[in-house]
């Protein structure tokens, strides 16, 4: 499994997990976050390896679809880049820096 895809799926999962069914959440979390194999997940839930694979592939598409429609992750990335740029551009403005850090903290608490 390629690391970029794993990282992306883990990140999308963080943003959209609450929109998934319990089964989708379990399979994706075990597969991507906990690095379980398809066989291990199948054994855990007493289903076929193919059923796990199919569910994971469908859930990946669902997560990508949510991001395509809602843009939570991409907006988060852009927002953080802008905050970092402002902090670098105005490092001596302590009031601005503190407010920018508050914004970052809000983002971190949400996700």
UniProtKB/Swiss-Prot annotation:
Disulfide bonds: none annotated. It comes from the Bacteria. InterPro entries: RNA_pol_sigma_r3/r4-like, UPF0122, UPF0122_fam_protein, WH-like_DNA-bd_sf. HAMAP family: UPF0122 (MF_00245). Belongs to the UPF0122 family. PANTHER family: UPF0122 PROTEIN CBO2450/CLC_2298 (PTHR40083), UPF0122 PROTEIN YLXM (PTHR40083:SF1). Might take part in the signal recognition particle (SRP) pathway. This is inferred from the conservation of its genetic proximity to ftsY/ffh. May be a regulatory protein. This is UPF0122 protein llmg_1069. It comes from Lactococcus lactis subsp. cremoris (strain MG1363).
């Amino acid at each position: 499994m390629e690391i970029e895809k794993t990282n992306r799926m883990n990140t999308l999962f963080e943003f959209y997990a609450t929109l998934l069914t319990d089964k989708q959440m379990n399979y994706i979390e075990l597969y991507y976050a906990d690095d379980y194999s398809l066989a291990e997940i199948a054994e855990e839930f007493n289903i076929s390896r193919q059923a796990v694979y199919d569910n994971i592939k469908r859930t990946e598409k669902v997560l990508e679809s949510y991001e395509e429609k809602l843009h939570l992750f991409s907006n988060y990335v852009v927002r953080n880049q802008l905050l970092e740029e402002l902090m670098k551009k105005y490092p001596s403005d302590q009031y601005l820096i503190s407010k920018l850090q508050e914004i970052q903290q809000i983002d971190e608490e949400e996700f």
